[in-house]
UniProtKB/Swiss-Prot annotation:
Recorded GO MF terms: ABC-type D-methionine transporter activity; ATP binding; ATP hydrolysis activity
Coiled coil: none
One cellular component (GO) term of this entry: plasma membrane
Subunit structure: The complex is composed of two ATP-binding proteins (MetN), two transmembrane proteins (MetI) and a solute-binding protein (MetQ).
Keyword S-adenosyl-L-methionine on entry: no
Cellular localisation: Cell inner membrane
Source organism of the structure: Rhizobium meliloti (strain 1021) (Ensifer meliloti)
Record-listed E.C. numbers: 7.4.2.11
Protein name (database record): Methionine import ATP-binding protein MetN
UniProt: ATP binding residues: G52, R53, S54, G55, A56, G57, K58, S59
Catalyzed chemical reaction(s): L-methionine(out) + ATP + H2O = L-methionine(in) + ADP + phosphate + H(+); D-methionine(out) + ATP + H2O = D-methionine(in) + ADP + phosphate + H(+)
Amino acid sequence: MTLPRSEISAGDAVVFDAVSKRFPASGGNTAFTALDNVSLAVARGSITGIIGRSGAGKSTLIRLVNGLEKPSSGKVFVDGVDVGALDEAGLRDLRRSVGMIFQHFNLLSSRTVFGNVALPLEIAGMDRRAIEQRVRPLLELVGLADKHGRYPAELSGGQKQRIGIARALATEPKLLLSDEATSALDPETTQSILELLRRINAELGLTVLLITHEMEVVKAVTSDVAVIDKGEIVERGHTFDVFTHSRHETTRALLSGLAGSKLPEAVARGLKPAAASGDRVVVRLTFFGAAAERPLISQLIQSVGAEVNIIAGTIDEIGGKPYGSLVVAYGADAETSGKAERFFTENGLVTEVLGYVA
C-alpha cells in the first residue's frame, strides 16, 4: 500500500514520493529491488516508526533521507527540498540538519564523552567557546553531565548510546534518524533511551524517524507507524490504529511477538488449520477503550454458556489509551462459535482465528 499523493502535505518533514531502489546484481542476475514504489509522509514533530523484518528495506529507506543512497526512481524530500537534486555542498548542509544514531555507537575510544559530542562541531569549524556552550547543555539533557571527562570504555551501553544521541543533536538538527538504536540494549536500558527520545521530541520539537524490527519499541514511543515488507509499505497509520485494527499478515505476525500475545510453544505446535469433532477454536481478541476495563471474559462465558480458556494475554497503553490482547480457546462447534462471534461483534472486539486444537 502506498500513500496517495493527495495526502502528502508540503508541511511534512520527510516525503518519499513513489521511491524505488534497485541494486545491480553480479554475474548477469536480475537486479535486487530493495524498495518498490514507496510513498510515505513523515509528519513534522512526530515520532514515526518504520518497522519490518530483517531485509525488508528499512535501512535502505532511511539512508535515502540523508543522501547516503540515491533512489533508482522517485524522489525524497526533506523540508521540501529534493535530496536527489542537491550537489555536494547542498548534501553537506542537509546532513547538518539531520542527526543520526545507530545500533553500534561509533564512538572514538580515544576521545572523552565531551570530545565525542564536540566532534561534529569541530569539523564544522566552530570555535572552542561556542563548542563549550553547545556541548554542556546537551550533556545535561542526556544525563551525562557528570561523565564529561570519561572515556567510552568506562561507560555502559546505555550511556554510550546517550553520547551518540547528544552527538547527533550537536548541530541542532531538525530531524533525528534512529537506525535500530536500541537493538543492542537490554530491555530496561531500551526503555530509558526511548524515554529520552520522547523527551527530546517534546522539548526540542524534533521530528524522529525510527527504524526498528521490534513492536515493543513502536508501541512505547511512536505516534505513527509504517510497516514495510519486501520493499513495500504494506500498512501505515497512527500507532494505536495499526495495533488495534491491523489488516496485513506481516503486521499481525509482528504483533504476535509482543509480550503477553505470543502463544505458548505447546499450543502453537498443536494448532490445526481446520476443526475436527470436539476441537476448540483459538482466537486472538483485541480490545481497547471502555472494553479494556470491562470483565469481558466472564461476560463471554455467560454469553456462550461454555468453558473459555485464557491462553495468553496482555493489557497495556498505547498513546495513553488502554489496549488489550487476549488469546482464548472455546468449543469449535457451531452453536458455541456462533454465540461467541455475536458477543464479539456486539462488544466491538477485533478478532483473529489462529487455528484449532484438540
